[in-house]
Regions:
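Aromatic- and carboxylate-enriched substrate-binding clefts and catalytic-loop regions
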Residues: 1-105
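Acidic/polar loop patches that form or flank catalytic/metal-binding clefts of enzymes
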Residues: 23-30, 53-57, 123-137, 151-155, ...
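Conserved, mostly hydrophobic/aromatic
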Residues: 26, 119, 177, 238
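Catalytic domains of carbohydrate-active enzymes that cleave complex glycans
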Residues: 103, 112-124, 128-131
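Glycan-recognition and catalytic regions of carbohydrate-active enzymes
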Residues: 129-176, 180, 212-216
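Carbohydrate-binding surface patches
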Residues: 161-201, 241-242
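Solvent-exposed beta-strand/loop surfaces of large extracellular or lumenal domains
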Residues: 204-228
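C-terminal beta-strand-rich structural cap/linker in extracellular carbohydrate-active enzymes
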Residues: 222-246
Length: 246
């Protein structure tokens, strides 16, 4: 399906129609970017059409997935849902990544992987790593498992294509905020003025003190925020943060 010619496009539409007939959902992985099919067939939940995380199983270190990630919200994501397959628990800081098909790793930090579930729109999300790795990481796994896949409201709080982005999304009364950076470490200020007029409890996953050399390093903390709060968060090179507010 890795093509976008007339025959393949026609096949995708036939598959969507057949799945709708039998009340099945469809994830078109290995296909081209969406162009409105999910409006005609709402049972089509996701499309790949992206150089997703699976590429890290075989891509050389010269492939800069971190830079690519901060391009996607401004380019590919505009066309519709994206089956990027995030969620790696083996995370390599700059200079430590190498391709490994049997035990693949992501470029960048653990918190970057958590943030991608918020930054990228993906109504049919997945966990890309092995069950044993998730069992070893109950804090990260538990946080990912709670993140909704569809949203009532989305706001881009800050960003610059190819450098960084911070996105807030609401499901019901719960907000999630995710931020990622390129290989440049940076300090982000999250303006919480999008919140209502009360005090909220928040869970924050952010890059640990050693995340610049050990991508798995993170810090988890509970904070209280209001709509006049401005959270200052440091992002390691290739880093990120994920925040749940309720």
């Amino acid at each position: 399906m890795d093509r976008d010619d007339q025959l393949m496009t026609a096949f995708n539409y036939r598959a969507a129609e057949m799945c709708a007939k039998y009340k099945l959902i469809l994830d078109l992985h290995g296909t081209h970017k969406p162009a409105g099919m999910n409006r005609t067939y709402p049972n089509v939940l996701n499309f790949e059409g992206v150089n997703g995380l699976e590429q890290m199983k075989w891509s050389p270190a010269s492939v800069d997935q971190v830079k690519y990630d901060v391009m996607l919200p401004f380019t590919r994501q505009v066309s519709g849902p994206m089956d990027y397959t995030q969620g790696a628990m083996r995370n390599a800081s700059k200079g430590n990544y190498y391709p490994c098909n049997s035990e693949p790793m992501s470029q960048g930090t653990r918190c970057r992987q958590l943030a991608l579930y918020v930054v990228f729109e993906s109504p049919f999300n997945m966990l890309c790593d092995t069950p044993s790795n998730y069992m070893r990481e109950p804090e990260s796994t538990g946080f990912i498992a709670e993140i909704p896949t569809v949203w009532d409201e989305s706001i881009v709080l800050d960003g610059k294509m190819g450098e960084y982005i911070v996105t807030a999304r609401r499901s019901g009364n719960v907000w999630y905020v995710g931020g990622i950076t390129d290989w440049t470490a940076r300090d982000i200020e999250v303006d919480c003025s999008f919140l209502g007029d009360k005090t909220y409890d928040a869970t924050l996953f952010k890059d640990g003190a050693n995340a610049h050399r050990a991508g798995r390093d993170y810090k988890w903390e509970s904070v209280r925020v209001k709509n006049d709060s401005k959270l200052k968060i440091h992002l390691a090179p290739g880093g990120g943060f994920a925040l749940k507010i309720k």
